[in-house]
Amino acid sequence: LPVIFATRYGIDLWIWLRSVLGRRGVAVLSTIISVANFGWYAVAASLFSSSMINLAAKFGLVLNAAVWSPVLGCLCVVLGTLIALGGPNVIKWTNRFLVTALLAVGVVVVVLCFTAVPLREIVAVKPVLDADMTPLQAFMISAEGNVAFAFSWSTQALVLPRLAKTERGGYWGTTLAYGVVAPFFVAAGGVMALAMFVRTGVYESDPTNMLSYLCGSGFALLSLLLVAFANVGTQGTGSYVNCMIVKSGMPKVSYKVLVLIAMVYVSALTVWGGVEEHFGAF
């Protein structure tokens, strides 16, 4: 129903929440949620910078992480901001290209991981539990994380259907994106991490390191496409959606002003690095 409302009438989640929370309530809640959501984009920028540094190292170019990590992270944010400033049409075509390319890369990555490490060894990996944590507590923490993940994305997912021209397009675009494409990439990342653990005994989060170790340095170029395009595109789409969320509560504020404020905010979080350091609590 939220998708149909957004497509047919242009009434997204935050507009029809005014009937429950009122204009001031929506303004406060949308701002708080967007301020929190932007922390994830600082993590994405940090992942972009670390992957680019690691990729450069694979080809013999050593970059000082203390200098280049914040520089490359802010570059990711700036490139994403340019996409967001381009408006819905630029975002539409950017995502059409990115999703197609990244799906192809994702399929290749999964095949390579299963080729490098037998499936039976991947599925045999047991979860690592803290000594003071029971299996039930571990499950509860995982469930809480999944609920938080779904909640944070739902605040954005129910805005994007406004870009669709038909109800059918809005419905299938939203359903396939969050029901098929996003879970596929989560699963692909999990397969890569488990395969890396089987080979090295260490859990790794950087796809550049995982691909280069599992499949050779040549395949690390796939991570350049995966990480660079994905995180820059994520910055652009995320900036657009979250700024539109805030604008739903404060319609008189300029969209471009919100995007530029978001750029400064996410860049500051990226340079600080605290969100990634305390990601579990975040």
Please annotate each region the language model reported.
Residues 26-62, 228-248:
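Hydrophobic transmembrane alpha-helices that form the core helical bundles
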Residues 30, 59-86, 100-111, 138-157, ...:
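Transmembrane alpha-helical segments of multi-pass small-molecule transport proteins
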Residues 112-116, 128-194, 215-236:
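Hydrophobic, membrane-embedded alpha-helices of multi-pass small-molecule transporters
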Residues 6, 45-52, 81-90, 112-123, ...:
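Transmembrane helix-loop junctions in multi-pass membrane proteins
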Residues 86-99, 152-184, 202-208, 238-254:
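Hydrophobic, small-residue-rich membrane helices and short re-entrant helix-turn-helix hairpins
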Residues 3-4, 20, 28, 54-60, ...:
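Membrane-water interface regions at transmembrane-helix termini and the short interhelical loops
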Residues 1-21, 30-45:
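Juxtamembrane transmembrane-helix boundary signature
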Residues 1, 33-42, 101-113, 145, ...:
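Selective recognition of specific alpha-helical transmembrane segments in multi-pass small-molecule
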